[in-house]
């Protein structure tokens, strides 16, 4: 009877291990893709190891909580390894030493907090390192030193504190072209944090608790940068005309969802390659008359969700503007023949979004006639008769004077309130 019980226990154990083990399939004799078993799993040698033909391994969401030594032994052709969306809390020193041809390593969305110094010493060909969505709060000086070929680094959505980062952390990785710090606290980071970079193109600082444009993001060595993302921070003003003077190659500047109220009229002047500026969801009441003037490559400006009451054609004069968004401001009128004047002053306007705003009906009528006549795309779906889009007095003509603005804005807010109440009644 004891033998029977022992046999049953062994069978149950074997069955449990089999149930926990991810199921793997090989495609084209070189790409291994695994799916999760029914319980959490400790990765050990034998599941994906010992195959010199394997070039790619995907262990995404396989409920892996730990990786044992030799799990990746004898994978001399492996270049792609995806361990994302697991439950890994730490990586032991030496655990990824074997696949020396590795160029892509995805460790995103695990529970990592830090790395032992030397972890990457043997994978010197890494080109892409994805660490987003972990709990990393510390980067040991020297951790990236072996990664001289690193090109893409994603550190977003971790627990990094910029003021605690060593400014020499990337000194041996000068060829990084993409780095993402978004959803970390980067306020107070060292001014020379990125001083080693020689060819950075994209820097993402979204949701980084920044109160101003950080100086580490605008240094002279970053003249190669094409995209600078500063959205969803606490930047309140752009008053220094020299802020972006070093960023000659910049094509996209995203300042969405800050608290910007004032902008120096010359702040964008050095950006001769700028194509798109996103300033939506700030609190600007006015914009300088020459803010976007004579910018030879500027084609898109988004000013949605500010508090603008007046926007002059002069703001864009001499720029080849194609797309303009003025929706959700406090605009009751635009100057007569606004779109035609844009085109006559160098613009190539093709798409113009201007609703909702507290329009005077006569002014909106003139604008709609103009965009239709010129074949300009606009948000026509807003004009379905289901909600108020403008207000008028008995005198139906467009009053293009600022002193009338408050009256029409108040009227529009009253009409919206009445409409809201009637729908909820």
Question: What do these predicted ranges mean?
Answer:
Residues 2-425:
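Extracellular leucine-rich repeat
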């Amino acid at each position: 009877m004891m033998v029977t019980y022992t046999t049953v226990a062994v069978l149950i154990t074997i069955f449990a291990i089999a149930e926990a083990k991810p199921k793997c399939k090989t495609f084209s004799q070189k790409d291994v893709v695994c799916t999760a078993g029914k319980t959490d799993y400790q990765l050990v040698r034998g599941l994906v190891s010992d195959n010199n033909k394997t070039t790619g391994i995907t262990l995404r969401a396989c409920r892996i909580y730990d990786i044992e030594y030799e799990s990746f032994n004898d994978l001399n052709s492996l270049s792609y390894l995806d361990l994302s969306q697991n439950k890994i809390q730490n990586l032991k020193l030496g655990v990824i030493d074997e696949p020396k041809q590795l160029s892509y390593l995805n460790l995103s969305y695990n529970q990592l907090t830090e790395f032992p110094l030397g972890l990457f010493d043997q994978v010197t060909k890494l080109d892409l390192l994805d660490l987003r969505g972990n709990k990393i709060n510390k980067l040991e000086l020297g951790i990236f030193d072996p990664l001289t070929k690193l090109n893409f680094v994603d550190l977003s959505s971790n627990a990094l504190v910029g003021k605690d980062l060593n400014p020499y952390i990337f000194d041996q990785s000068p060829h990084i072209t993409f780095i993402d710090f978004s959803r970390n606290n980067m306020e107070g980071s060292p001014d020379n944090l990125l001083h080693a970079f020689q060819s950075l193109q994209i820097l993402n600082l979204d949701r980084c608790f920044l109160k101003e444009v950080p100086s580490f993001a605008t240094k002279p060595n970053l003249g190669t940068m094409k995209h600078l993302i500063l959205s969803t921070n606490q930047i309140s003003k752009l008053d220094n005309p020299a802020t972006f003077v070093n960023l000659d190659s910049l094509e996209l500047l995203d300042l969405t969802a800050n608290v910007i109220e004032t902008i120096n009229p010359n702040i964008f002047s050095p950006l001769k390659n700028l194509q798109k500026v996103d300033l939506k969801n700030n609190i600007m009441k006015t914009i300088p008359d020459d803010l976007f003037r004579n910018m030879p490559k500027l084609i898109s400006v988004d000013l949605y969700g500010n508090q603008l009451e007046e926007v002059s054609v002069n703001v864009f004069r001499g720029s080849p503007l194609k797309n303009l968004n003025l929706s959700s401001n406090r605009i009751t009128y635009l100057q007569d023949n606004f779109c035609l004047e844009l085109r006559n002053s160098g613009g190539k306007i093709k798409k113009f979004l201007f609703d909702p705003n507290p329009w005077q009906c006569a002014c909106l009528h003139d604008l709609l006639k103009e965009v239709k006549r010129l074949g300009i795309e606009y948000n026509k779906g807003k004009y379905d008769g289901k909600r108020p889009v403008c207000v008028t007095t008995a005198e139906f003509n467009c009053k293009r004077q600022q002193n009338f603005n408050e009256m029409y804005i108040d009227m529009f807010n009253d009409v919206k309130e009445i409409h809201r109440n009637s729908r909820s009644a």
